[in-house]
Amino acid sequence: KSLICFLYAKYSKDDKFISHFTDQFNSEKYKDYSDGNYYNLVLSVSGLDKSISISNYLNNFINSDSPQIEARFRSSLPGVSDPETPKVVIEAILNETIRGADAPYLLAGLISHHENGKNAWEIIKLNWKDLLKVMPEWTSSRILDGLPSVYDEHIGKDIQDFIKLNPLPSAEKLMKQKFERLNANIKFKNSINSVLKKAKFV
């Protein structure tokens, strides 16, 4: 049910539906919920509202009173639609507010965000060497996990060109797999767009 609710909120952009969750987030009523799935749903749907600040999520992550709550907020960070999200999250990684071991997964999430992905990638490129320094070498390749969710041809090409020139440690095989998936997705999207342009709707 939680997944269905989130997908509905994400793709329908039903303001009334989303505000039901943002009201709970702003009032902090959700913090009293024992149902972990619903708690996570409030965080994920509220993050779709651009008026909800990433700083709110990050502060809750920093001040969480249990490992479980910390994990919930950490995993929610990349999905927050606030335009400042990429900058704030990447700064938190660089100053080690967020553990380096968790960084690749969050960077992957930032890249795959449907609205903030392009900006996230630009900031990641600018800080590439410093980001690699704060994360364990064996986890850095997980940054590539965000590539299958990229459908923009220009961003996809830029990512591939950059990573080929600035390869991740011990990630040659994974890089090839992710690039193949990325290119397949872009090709599929382009073919669908081509069909739709030629289609005649009565």
Predicted regions span which residues?
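Long, ordered, helix-rich scaffold segments
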Residues: 1-202
